[in-house]
Amino acid sequence: MKDVPAFLQQSQSSGPGQAAVWHRLEELYTKKLWHQLTLEVLDFVQDPCFAQGDGLIKLYENFISEFEHRVNPLSLVEIILHVVRQMTDPNVALTFLEKTREKVKSSDEAVILCKTAIGALKLNIGDLQATKETIEDVEEMLNNLPGVTSVHSRFYDLSSKYYQTIGNHASYYKDALRFLGCVDIKDLPVSEQQERAFTLGLAGLLGEGVFNFGELLMHPVLESLRDTDRQWLIDTLYAFNSGAVDRFQTLKCAWGQQPDLAANEAQLLRKIQLLCLMEMTFTRPANHRQLTFEEIAKSAKITVNKVELLVMKALSVGLVRGSIDEVDKRVHMTWVQPRVLDLQQIKGMKDRLELWCTDVKSMEMLVEHQAQDILT
């Protein structure tokens, strides 16, 4: 049994800058006001006075451990995460988190947060297989939670870092975007916003099967790169989103300086040519989706004899649906994969909708004026 009052009294005298807080903790503990005490501790563990040393470990051992069974499980794990950061031996930290997981097993969210922290530690020490297993385990639990909770962002942060480590661009792109969807961008330092925007942009360009850039283009995190030496990435992403092959080639002087992009130039060209075909299909009216080989070749910057191969690739990966008329050298498109649209694409849809409304109005007037002839 720890002498809690003695520890709190000693802490008050040894840390005069936080004496009032220590006194408040003692008062709440004595009165057994566990909820108020939990809130006070949650705030206190983030105090700059604990930035160095092992103060949080001592706080846990001599104080928090005495009433942790009365603390809300999720709040307890939130507190424990701060304590763990002061443990220099990762194995000690892992053991501590495993014990904590047992203590909070009554709460799924608390267990998820605890397992996520365990996964983060395993990733830091390079145990990729254990990290992968933890992610798979936690993801299954996460899918059973109703809505988006406070633990989602921590999980997606872990999973995206894991995919970044193993070089899985597509999965990193997906989960890094999910992370940003769970946090307030204003809570991230500008430097972190810029780094996340840059790595996300590269992952989107390099990710196999990633053809949807609209969500990233509409996210405010990308604006952190505007008017910086990485502005070219925004321009390149917009070029890809609109399938502008010529714009992509013009920007080569910028993206060509980035080693990963330069090394995958052929792959990037194939991707933007597929996006070009998607954009051509999307911008055509539904009743006029006959594309000639010459039109496709001109926009995609390829020779006519390579058009059929490009269309077959787009059909095989499910980007478009349609048929190829080899005799007339035409492609009839019936469907294009839905994507998150940027503002320019939305404007294009608005213009086409207005044109359609005009056509409907004209037909209405025609029927009205010639109704007698039609009926007789």
UniProtKB/Swiss-Prot annotation:
Cellular component GO terms, alphabetical: proteasome accessory complex; proteasome regulatory particle
UniProt modified residues of type N6-acetyllysine: 298
Coiled coil: none
Tagged with keyword Repeat: no
Cross-referenced PROSITE patterns: PCI
The entry's keywords: Acetylation, Proteasome
PCI domain residues: 171-338
Classification via InterPro entries: PCI_dom, PSD13_N, PSMD13, WH_DNA-bd_sf
Highest rank taxon of the organism: Eukaryota
A matching Pfam family: PSD13_N
One Gene Ontology MF term: endopeptidase activity
This protein's record includes keyword Acetylation: yes
One record GO biological process: meiosis I
Record function comment: Component of the 26S proteasome, a multiprotein complex involved in the ATP-dependent degradation of ubiquitinated proteins. This complex plays a key role in the maintenance of protein homeostasis by removing misfolded or damaged proteins, which could impair cellular functions, and by removing proteins whose functions are no longer required. Therefore, the proteasome participates in numerous cellular processes, including cell cycle progression, apoptosis, or DNA damage repair.
Similarity comment: family membership: Belongs to the proteasome subunit S11 family.
Subunit structure: Component of the 19S proteasome regulatory particle complex. The 26S proteasome consists of a 20S core particle (CP) and two 19S regulatory subunits (RP). The regulatory particle is made of a lid composed of 9 subunits including PSMD13, a base containing 6 ATPases and few additional components.
The protein's name in its UniProt record: 26S proteasome non-ATPase regulatory subunit 13
